[in-house]
Amino acid sequence: MTQPSKTTKLTKDEVDRLISDYQTKQDEQAQETLVRVYTNLVDMLAKKYSKGKSFHEDLRQVGMIGLLGAIKRYDPVVGKSFEAFAIPTIIGEIKRFLRDKTWSVHVPRRIKELGPRIKMAVDQLTTETQRSPKVEEIAEFLDVSEEEVLETMEMGKSYQALSVDHSIEADSDGSTVTILDIVGSQEDGYERVNQQLMLQSVLHVLSDREKQIIDLTYIQNKSQKETGDILGISQMHVSRLQRKAVKKLREALIEDPSMELM
C-alpha cells in the first residue's frame, strides 16, 4: 500500500479505519500514517502559540504528544470529526506547557514556597472536616491572607472561584445540585480541589445571563425565587436556565482534554 504524504487529505472513513486499526490492533503503521498526515496541523498550532519565539520546537513536540493522545482516545461514535477532537487536545498540551513554563520563570519565590504549604493544609483540613476547605479556612490555618492563598492557587490553576461543596437549587421542587455533581468526585485532598476548581476555565461556555444565574444561585447563595426577582424573570425561567448552564458546564468539562477531570 502506498503511504500517503503528510499533505495527503484522508477521508473521514479512512481516518476512522486507521484509528480503529491502531486502537484495536496496536497497528504502528496506522499510527505513523496518521502522524504523517497531521504533522502540518501540529506545526500550524505550534506556530500560532510560539509566535516566532525560541520555544517553537518545544511546542511542536508537546503538540505531537497531544496528537498521539488524540489518536489513542478518539471515538468516532461521538459524531465529531477527528480534526475537531484533535485540535483542542493538541492545544491543551501546548497551553499546559506554556502554563508550566510561565510558572517556572515568572512566579515569585513567595508564591512557589506557599504552594506546597497550601497542599499540606488542604490535605489536613480535608481529613479533619471531611470536605474541601474554603479559602478563608486555608488562610487561617497557614496564618496568611486570603489574597495570598487566592493568588497562589490562581497562578497554579487551582484557585476556588466556586465553593465546590456548596449546593444550589436544581429545580423548583427543592432538589439541589453541587458542582461536584456536575464534574463527579473520585479524588480527595489537594488533587480533588485542584481538579474540581478548574471548572472556572470552562465558565466561558455560558451566556451572560447563564453566568448571572450561576453567580446569584451558586456564589451568592440566593434562591431561584430571589434570583428571578433580581433579574425580573420567573422562577421557572431561572430553573430552566440553571439546568441549561449546568448541562453546558458538564459537557465542556467532558470535551476539554486539558481539564484532566476524567
Swiss-Prot record:
Q: What induces it?
A: By heat shock, salt stress, oxidative stress, glucose limitation, oxygen limitation and entry into stationary phase. Association with RNAP core increases during alcohol, NaOH, NaCl stress and during sporulation (at protein level).
A Gene Ontology molecular function term of the record: DNA binding
**CDD domains listed in its UniProt record:** Sigma70_r4
Signal peptide position in this chain?
Answer: none
Pfam families (alphabetical): Sigma70_r2 (PF04542), Sigma70_r3 (PF04539), Sigma70_r4 (PF04545)
Q: Does the keyword S-adenosyl-L-methionine apply?
A: no
Say yes or no: keyword Thylakoid present.
Answer: no
InterPro entries named among the record's database cross-references? RNA_pol_sigma-70_dom (IPR014284), RNA_pol_sigma-B (IPR014288), RNA_pol_sigma-B/F/G (IPR014322), RNA_pol_sigma70 (IPR000943), RNA_pol_sigma70_r2 (IPR007627), RNA_pol_sigma70_r3 (IPR007624), RNA_pol_sigma70_r4 (IPR007630), RNA_pol_sigma_r2 (IPR013325)
Question: What biological-process GO terms show up in the record?
Answer: DNA-templated transcription initiation; regulation of DNA-templated transcription
What UniProt keywords are attached to this protein's entry?
DNA-binding, Sigma factor, Stress response, Transcription, Transcription regulation
DNA-binding region ranges: 224-243
Chain location of the short sequence motif Polymerase core binding per the record: 58-71
Q: How does it assemble?
A: Interacts transiently with the RNAP core.
Q: What does this protein do?
A: Sigma factors are initiation factors that promote the attachment of RNA polymerase (RNAP) to specific initiation sites and are then released. Sigma B is not essential for sporulation; rather it is required for maximal expression of ctc and csbA which are transcribed in the early stationary phase under conditions inimical to sporulation. May play a role in the ability of the bacterium to adapt to various stresses but is not essential for its survival under these conditions. Positively regulates expression of its own operon.
Q: Could you say which protein family the record assigns here?
A: Belongs to the sigma-70 factor family. SigB subfamily.
Q: Which NCBIfam families match?
A: SigBFG, sigma70-ECF, Sigma_B
PANTHER family referenced in this protein's UniProt entry, alphabetically: RNA POLYMERASE SIGMA-E FACTOR (PTHR30385:SF4), SIGMA FACTOR F FLAGELLAR (PTHR30385)
Q: What is this protein called?
A: RNA polymerase sigma-B factor
Give the organism, scientific name.
Bacillus subtilis (strain 168)
Q: What is the lineage of its organism?
A: Bacteria, Bacillati, Bacillota, Bacilli, Bacillales
The gene it comes from is sigB
